[in-house]
Curated annotation (Swiss-Prot):
The protein's name in its UniProt record: Uncharacterized protein R306
Top-rank taxon: Viruses
Organism of derivation: Acanthamoeba polyphaga mimivirus
Lineage per the UniProt record: Viruses, Varidnaviria, Bamfordvirae, Nucleocytoviricota, Megaviricetes
Keywords: Coiled coil
Short name of any one Pfam family annotated for the protein: PP2C
Family annotation (InterPro entries): PPM-type-like_dom_sf, PPM-type_phosphatase-like_dom
Residue ranges constituting the PPM-type phosphatase domain according to the UniProt record: 6-111
Length: 111
């Protein structure tokens, strides 16, 4: 069914010298992660990483969440346990690469 989606983003830097937030919006995706017919949108993906783990963590996590969520082997809607496994896998990558200084990512994704 055709529909129109308009998305906006805004950010408040606060007291830090730079904004560490990272947002990723992919609209109108097929399960392959590729754009679909512009009139139809089976999946819209919104990811927000608030930077509390540091900018490097936010920049690392956002595209990886996109890749894991849009994996061709996934069946939607994703089950809570599967989403938890995705977050655990990315967290283990962060720790393994020495990027994460803490055990949390502070990211949300919606599809």
């Amino acid at each position: 069914m055709p529909r129109k989606i308009t998305s906006y983003k805004t950010s408040l830097q606060g007291l830090r010298e730079e904004n560490e937030d990272v947002e990723l919006m992919n609209l109108n995706l097929l399960l392959t992660g590729k754009p679909n017919n512009p009139k139809y949108a089976p999946i819209d993906l919104f990811i927000v990483c608030d930077g509390h783990g540091g900018k490097e963590v936010a920049e690392y996590v956002a595209p990886r969440l996109n890749r894991y969520i849009m994996n061709n082997n996934n069946t939607f809607p994703l089950h809570r346990q599967h989403v938890a496994k995705i977050y655990d896998a990315i967290q283990n990558e962060l720790i393994g690469k020495g990027i994460a200084r803490t055990w949390w990512m502070y990211c949300s994704s919606y599809y």
